[in-house]
A protein has these predicted regions:
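Conserved active-site segment immediately N-terminal to the catalytic lysine
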Residues: 151-189, 219-220, 226-231
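PLP-dependent aminotransferase-like
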Residues: 64-160
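Short beta-strand-to-turn element immediately C-terminal to the catalytic PLP-Schiff-base lysine
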Residues: 180-181, 194-199, 248
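N-terminal "arm"/small-domain region of PLP-dependent enzymes with the aminotransferase-like
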Residues: 1-27, 229-231, 363
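Structural detector of well-ordered beta-strand residues that form the stable sheet scaffold
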Residues: 50, 75, 96, 149-150, ...
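PLP-dependent aminotransferase class I/II
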Residues: 34-38, 43-47, 110, 122-126, ...
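A short alpha/beta connector and helix-capping loop motif
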Residues: 106-113, 164-177, 370-383
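Phosphate-binding glycine-rich loop
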Residues: 26-73, 86-91, 97-98, 164
């Protein structure tokens, strides 16, 4: 079976973990943590970034930094992973779900403003498949209503946004805060692992304190105070040094990994764009390809197809499985989930529901190249 995902190892992970063990610094914020954070700040222009134990923890740190609580509202897309909403629910805030665009799964910025109330505090755009949301539109709305923006960039490492001002900015640098994931399904991995990016100076000091279990320990180790203690809320968000060592082995090869993933993504694009292939998909089997807006770049996190309905998608997945190729659907709508549907305000979110029924993801990982022709042959057969 050709899997949907296979974690790629560069070959240096075990060596760097051994180095971390030999250094005797295991609990985090050691040499490898600093290397990773410095590399990411310099490469992408984050004002400050902090490694976390997961992308979920990065979101939970961001939620704490926004200061939301009971009575506050946070606008979140329904077509996303549960962590996007959970982080704010755990603070006591109410999540207000917004629909996706009709031409791509990202948040529909034109639907945000009508959902803003005096209780709204935060907007959380999710860059689906590593493709940028319309950040100029979102930031304009946020600035007009004095709201915070937290970018959920879990899938968006090494992806960029071209603003109306002509500036090219890394995703995760545009909102007040940004969150990334290094889960094993992502482009760059650490098993688990995540990253919080802080782009607003107001949040830098408090982010370090929350990261260090509510203490000013980071200031103590920089020699800024002569002792450290409990000064705020926080938790154990700092990952072990072994996680940072693993991540550093990946970051050293970031350009190589990205180049390979983009080659594989482009192979898919050219195959499905070919008129002969498109002509073989008849009637209800017709598909749509991913849309990359002019303001977005493609980081090759995911290649997906959109089928006309659930039945045709299910048929395609079954036919691919019969040929030993694993293709998978993605999110179930959060607004109609078992946990939240009674709390939702009842608004229909038709685009979100459509993507939940029709989107299918194809295998895409470093090392797929020897098997990609088999995947494409299976696709041709499944669409015949």
């Amino acid at each position: 079976m050709i899997p949907f995902n296979r974690p790629y190892l560069t070959g240096r992970e075990a060596e760097y973990i051994r180095q971390a063990l030999a250094a005797g610094k295991l609990s985090g914020n050691g040499e490898f943590t600093k290397r990773c954070q410095n590399f990411l700040e310099e490469r992408y222009g984050f004002r400050k970034c902090l490694l976390t134990t997961s992308g979920t923890d990065a979101l939970e740190m961001a939620a704490l930094l926004t200061g939301v609580g009971p009575g506050d509202e946070v606008i979140v897309p329904s077509y996303t992973f549960v962590s996007t909403a959970l982080a704010f629910l755990r603070c006591g805030a109410r999540v207000v779900f917004v629909d996706s665009r009709d031409d791509e799964p990202n948040i529909d910025a034109t639907k945000i403003e009508s959902l803003i109330t005096p209780h709204t505090k935060v907007i959380v755009p999710v860059h689906y498949a590593g493709c940028a949301c319309d950040m100029d539109a979102i930031m304009e709305i946020a600035n007009r209503h004095k709201l915070l923006v937290v970018e959920d960039a879990a899938q968006a490492i090494d992806s960029f946004y071209m603003g109306r001002d002509g500036k090219r900015r890394a995703l995760g640098t545009i909102g007040h805060l940004g969150c990334f994931s290094f889960h094993e399904t992502k482009n760059i991995i650490a098993g688990e692992g995540g990253l919080l990016t802080i782009n607003d100076e107001r949040f830098v000091r408090r982010a370090e304190i929350i990261w260090e279990k509510g203490t000013n320990r980071a200031e103590f180790f920089r020699g800024e105070v002569n002792k450290y203690g409990w000064v705020d809320i926080g938790s154990s968000f700092l990952p072990a040094e072994s996680v940072a060592a693993f991540l550093w082995a990946q970051l050293e090869h970031l350009d190589e990994i990205q180049a390979e993933r983009k080659r594989l993504w482009q192979n898919y694009w050219e195959f499905f764009s070919d008129r002969t292939v498109a002509a073989s998909a008849t009637g209800a089997d017709k598909y749509c390809l991913p849309r990359i807006p002019d303001y977005a770049t493609n980081n090759a996190h995911m290649f997906y197809l959109l089928f006309p309905d659930l039945a045709n998608r299910s048929d395609f997945i079954a036919k691919m499985k019969a040929q030993d190729v694993s293709c998978v659907f993605h999110y179930l709508p959060l607004h109609s989930s078992e946990y939240y549907r009674a709390k939702h305000d009842g608004r229909a979110l038709p685009n979100c529901d459509r993507y939940a029924d029709t989107l299918v993801r194809l295998p895409l990982y470093y090392g797929l190249e020897p098997d990609q022709d088999k995947v494409l042959a299976a696709v041709k057969s499944a669409l015949a």
